Amino acid sequence: MYGHLSLSALSLFAVVAAAPFRESWLQPRDSPVSQLFRRTAPDPNSNDYMSYYPGPGSTPNVSTIPQAWLDKLATVNLPNVPVATPDGGRPTYPNNEDDGDSTICSFTDQCRVEDDLYSPPGEKIWALSFDDGPTDVSPALYDYLAQNNISSSATHFMIGGNVITSPQSVLVAVKAGGHLAVHTWSHPYMTTLTNEQVVGELGWTMQALSDLNGGRIPMYWRPPYGDVDNRVRAIAKEVFGLVTVLWDSDTNDWAITDEPGQYSVASVEAYFDTLVTGNRTQGLLLLEHELDNNTVEVFETEYPKAVGNGWTVKNVADAFNMEWYLNSGKGNNDVVTTMSVAGTLTTATPTNTSTYVASSTAASSASVTDSAGVSIASAASSEASSSWAIANRPSHFVIAIACGLALAAIMV
């Protein structure tokens, strides 16, 4: 009977047949299908770009935190460590609890845990990193890194508020191959924040960096002032899969001033010399900054000395033989596994116009474990850019028409 149908009739059949497919494709927001899609990153060139994030310069309001992040937090069995109180730059704990004991384990008191990254393995490996970017001097630093072919050998621990105010600088670092990591949203003493505030500081910075780096989710974070304890470590690791990165030597480049008797460019460089030009062979993970001209000058002076003395610079991930990102391998061009921050799959919504909605992990998602041993939710499919793939996916309407035409050719 089909042999007598005209081509136009078969095409019409294809159009009609396509309707149920399109209806099933347009799933409600809370359906498992929609939960599989990555959030669409806002355009950093658009006038409303910053409206998709909390305001810079202060801890994000808890009301801006996606519910999925809070739901994940609720599943974490946190250690019994109280919130610390700010006390002149050294957070203190109730009842004069010892912040250096194994229960609290604050790095302010030089306490570390096994999972912390502290000194890289291997001889004369310099795990190169810069905190506090992007800033006004970041372009000059990035130019120097590029000129010396070491852009991909540097980890940039970026402040979320700086990221959204200077997205073009971040894009320069990404294009050059720089490794992006988290330095919180507003650079607070993290142990003095509530659990929810810790989530906001970390999660929003991860989201802002991911949005500018093809959906790659940061895997590493460095606590401002080195202020971290076991409660904050647990939130970073169990909610977001973040690895805590500390340092084995503070260059004090951040403290350089013109005041007599204080740190100067010359004194910081003199200390730097003892690390990279002496007989030391143990790996280095230094505290350095892309903060101002002084910090950049120190690095540009010391880098040639280190190389001349046999040191090899690597970014933090490579120095510890680990992956760069939670959902990608090494580099900013590796394939991205479809997932989003805290294993959720969401759509961007301006935070100043409506509540940010983040879906929970879809039932059809697979549980995978990253190299740090953290279980994260990852969609079963892997696409280099799922948002691109979705936007360019042939519609069922088109597919149905094509099938109808093919059927017509066979039947005639």
UniProtKB/Swiss-Prot annotation:
Applied biotechnology uses: A strain lacking CDA1, CDA2, and CDA3 is a potential vaccine candidate; inoculation with heat-killed CDA1-CDA2-CDA3 knockout cells in mouse induces protective immunity to subsequent virulent fungal infection.
Signal peptide: 1-18
InterPro entries: Glyco_hydro/deAcase_b/a-brl, NODB_dom, Polysacc_deacetylase_ArnD
Annotated stretches, region: Disordered: 82-103
Annotated glycan sites: 61, 149, 279, 293, 352
Lipidation (GPI-anchor amidated serine): 387
Listed GO CC annotations: extracellular region; fungal-type cell wall; plasma membrane; side of membrane
Membrane topology listed for this record: Lipid-anchor; GPI-anchor
Propeptide: 19-39, 388-412
Localization in the cell: Cell membrane
Swiss-Prot/TrEMBL keywords: Carbohydrate metabolism, Cell membrane, Cell wall biogenesis/degradation, Chitin degradation, Chitin-binding, Cleavage on pair of basic residues, Cobalt, Glycoprotein, GPI-anchor, Hydrolase, Lipoprotein, Membrane, Metal-binding, Polysaccharide degradation, Signal
Active-site residue list: 131 (proton acceptor), 289 (proton donor)
Primary location recorded for the protein, binned into one broad class: membrane
CDD domains recorded: CE4_MrCDA_like (cd10952)
Residues in coiled coil: none
EC number(s) recorded for this UniProt protein: 3.5.1.41
Location of the NodB homology domain: 124-314
Amino-acid positions noted as binding Co(2+) in the UniProt annotation, renumbered to this chain: 132, 183, 187
Description of the deletion phenotype: Inoculation of live or dead cells in mouse leads to an aberrant host hyperinflammatory immune response and host death. Triple knockout of CDA1, CDA2 and CDA3 results in an absence of cell wall chitosan, melanization of surrounding media, an increase in capsule size, sensitivity to cell wall (sodium dodecyl sulfate), osmotic (NaCl) and heat stress, and avirulence in a mouse intranasal infection model.
PROSITE patterns noted in UniProt: NODB
GO MF annotation, one: chitin deacetylase activity
Induction (free text): Repressed by the antifungal agent caspofungin.
Protein family (similarity comment): Belongs to the polysaccharide deacetylase family.
Record's function text: Hydrolyzes the N-acetamido groups of N-acetyl-D-glucosamine residues in chitin to form chitosan and acetate. Chitosan is required to anchor melanin to the cell wall, for maintenance of cell wall integrity, and for proper cytokinesis. Chitosan offers an advantage during infection as it is less readily detected than chitin by host immunosurveillance mechanisms.
Protein name: Chitin deacetylase 3
Species whose genome carries this gene: Cryptococcus neoformans var. grubii serotype A (strain H99 / ATCC 208821 / CBS 10515 / FGSC 9487)
